[in-house]
Amino acid sequence: MSKKIQSVRGMNDYLPVETAVWQRVERIIKSVVESYGYSEIRTPILEQTPLFKRAIGEVTDVVEKEMYTFNDRERDAKEVVSLTLRPEGTAGCVRAGIEHGLLYNQEQRLWYMGPMFRHERPQKGRYRQFHQIGLEVFGLQGPDIDAELIMLTARWWRELGISEHVTLELNSIGSLEARANYRDALVAFLEQHKEKLDEDCKRRMYTNPLRVLDSKNPEVQALLNDAPALGDYLDEESREHFAGLCKLLESAGIAYTVNQRLVRGLDYYNRTVFEWVTNSLGSQGTVCAGGRYDGLVEQLGGRATSAVGFAMGLERLVLLVQAVNPEFKADPVVDIYLVASGADTQPAAMALAERLRDELPGVKLMTNHGGGNFKKQFGRADKWGARIAVVLGESEVANGTAVVKDLRSGEQTAVAQDSVAAHLRTLLG
């Protein structure tokens, strides 16, 4: 017997019982996004490696440790090209916008959803292949669009029933110049206390010192209580931008906490950064995160363009929804199950099923196949979550009727086949 081949570590299969829950979550997410006027963009999962090095930063953990990268060669070409499975969605979205002229003096509001890849240690809520939804806005620089993105996410939480289990953390990391000044002050402070830093922080101190601020080491966190505050180094425009954002959120009734150690892990951010966090998923507390990246388009070869966006991991979101909202169930696979007794009734049953699909668009109808007595067929209807059974026996076929049975109340009615669709429409509401 041949050896079974298993899935790659950290890359999961999602079986029908799981994908049904995912699909309901995704429907809610998409409905909210589209209600705000965003348009979907789809980009490749493979990009040239320099895109991520330039966008994310060469000394970030993502680029240094976590990317799936390989060399590729066209059949007739001598040049080897380095390609990478996308670890995040913003860089590819910006690349596509520049390449196709979407960002030239234009406002764009885009969203995307799909798999991303990072070579991390797999654990609950963090996998090597994971799925993200992201929103990106180009061409708008005021705090009002930052606020709208946060309001949109707050609407998600309400629709998913998790509002009481997520909290918003905000910060401003200022302009590139202000952040450079703060970086120098932070490095000077860390050098004075180098003996108190762990090896990871010592490495980051010179390569990416702002990442020391979100160290999980309790001793480092205690040391940082005396470190220079990022807020003291903000330029005036960034202060005004952040104050405007806070005022808009307060007007919308969205509570937040200012966290001056919130910096995000990617180099392209400036000014606004934010995270929605939860205490309901253990150590994996971040549910959704993003911020402003006004310099990235120019950095990747386009014209200077204001930009802001965020991304959310769907695995973590589904875990949270299921953990805190037990009433959240997958939509039924089937609304109506068509029961047919005997092979002689099957042609009529299948013809009726097709007619009902024509007359009831959007209704999920499954026809019984494989025979079986009525008891077995009603058992299958229950397994698929059907609310209603339409029953065709030999007598119904002969006289042009069908029995419509409400599987919740047990009530059933004989209906002319030409009237079955109207009767079902009434029952389904």
UniProtKB/Swiss-Prot annotation:
CDD domains tied to this protein: HisRS-like_core, HisRS_anticodon
Listed InterPro entries: aa-tRNA-synth_II, aa-tRNA-synth_II/BPL/LPL, Anticodon-bd, Anticodon-bd_dom_sf, His-tRNA-ligase, HisRS-like_core, HisRS/HisZ, HisRS_anticodon
Molecular function via GO: ATP binding; histidine-tRNA ligase activity
Localization in the cell: Cytoplasm
Keyword Acyltransferase: no
Main location: cytoplasm
Record's GO cellular component terms: cytoplasm
GO biological process, one term: histidyl-tRNA aminoacylation
Alphabetical list of PROSITE patterns matching this protein: AA_TRNA_LIGASE_II
Transmembrane segments: none
Reaction it catalyzes: tRNA(His) + L-histidine + ATP = L-histidyl-tRNA(His) + AMP + diphosphate + H(+)
First-tier enzyme category under EC: ligase
This protein's record includes keyword Thylakoid: no
E.C. no: 6.1.1.21
Keyword field: Aminoacyl-tRNA synthetase, ATP-binding, Cytoplasm, Ligase, Nucleotide-binding, Protein biosynthesis
NCBIfam families: hisS (TIGR00442)
Quaternary structure and interacting proteins, as annotated: Homodimer.
Family annotation (PANTHER family): HISTIDINE--TRNA LIGASE, MITOCHONDRIAL-RELATED, HISTIDYL-TRNA SYNTHETASE
Family to which the UniProt record says this protein belongs: Belongs to the class-II aminoacyl-tRNA synthetase family.
Protein name: Histidine--tRNA ligase
Organism taxonomic ancestry: Bacteria, Pseudomonadati, Pseudomonadota, Gammaproteobacteria, Enterobacterales
Gene name, Swiss-Prot/TrEMBL: hisS
